[in-house]
Amino acid sequence: MIKNKLVFTDKALGVYDIYIKKATVMLRKDLKRYDDVIITGHLAPYLLVPSQVDLVVVLRRSPKYLLQTFKERNYTITKIRENITSEILGITLYDSIKKFGKQKIIEFDTTAASSKEIIKRLIEALNDESKRRIGDIDWMSTLKHHQELLKLVSY
């Protein structure tokens, strides 16, 4: 992404970001070269069209543990607030459903799961549609137990 000049610095948040339109053009061009592709990242709903997608797996994680991770990465408070709020509200899930439709979405809480467990659950969901679930994760109800998170998302 950096080599292709798709990345810029968001000075307000103190982080790198990408030019969505440029990334979309590059990704669509690259996708034509392959039959099967796995794309990771929260930007999929903004870079892909429904016809390019067979299945979307939305990985969720407890905001409490995300907060810890973001602090370890030295994210700015603005970036932490943006990411935590997005997870609490389920923005990536919402945008994925809106873009690709519920039938193409699987959602997993990865908070206490190992990579091996997540892969096992994914394979089960691929083989058995009854294991495909969305909308079961509710971080809002956990906020009252985490004062630091509550303060963080209160404006």
Please place each PLM-identified region on the residue numbering:
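ATP-dependent NMP and nucleoside kinases share a basic, alpha-helical "lid"
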Residues: 41-79
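Short, hinge-like loop/turn segments at secondary-structure boundaries
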Residues: 9-14, 56-58, 98
